[in-house]
């Protein structure tokens, strides 16, 4: 998720990426998560198109944000948290607190849409454009196959 209305994701002051993680795996990697797993965010069932069981999963948020340093240069920081528990924060890391996550200060993703959407860094490509057409072609082929089979039966 980025700030609505920006056309370049690098212009957004915050960038959020959400993922579903298994609670047991979270507790084994991050001991501070013990007793804090569960569904505190309602987005878990909307992250994936498929209807998957989210009872033993938690939403983990990767938050990238830009803040000016003492000289006014924008520095990129990163915070990973789940259900209000901070799992990692670059501002708390002595090696990254001043210089940020990356020296270039840019978010770690690049959008390369074929057809851009208005007021958004996202877009779509030929697969998005042709998906419905291909579905119609497949249904038509199936109908012709069935019709051919029915017409070829001996009477």
Q: Residue locations for each model-derived region?
A:
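Extended alpha-helical, oligomerization-prone segments that build pores/tubes and scaffolds
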Residues: 1-155
């Amino acid at each position: 998720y980025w700030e609505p209305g920006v056309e370049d994701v690098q212009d957004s002051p915050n960038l959020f990426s959400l993922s579903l993680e298994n609670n047991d795996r979270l507790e084994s990697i991050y001991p501070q998560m013990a007793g804090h797993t569960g569904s505190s965010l309602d987005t878990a069932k909307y992250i994936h198109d498929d209807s998957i069981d989210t009872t033993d999963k938690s939403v983990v948020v990767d938050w990238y944000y830009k803040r000016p340093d003492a000289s006014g240069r924008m520095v990129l920081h990163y915070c990973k948290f789940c259900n209000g528990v901070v799992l990692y924060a670059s501002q708390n890391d002595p090696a990254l607190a001043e210089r940020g996550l990356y020296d270039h200060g840019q978010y770690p993703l690049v959008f390369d849409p074929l057809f851009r959407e208005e007021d958004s860094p996202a877009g779509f490509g030929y697969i998005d454009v042709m998906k419905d057409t291909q579905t119609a072609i497949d249904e038509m082929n199936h109908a012709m196959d069935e019709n051919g089979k029915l017409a070829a039966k001996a009477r």
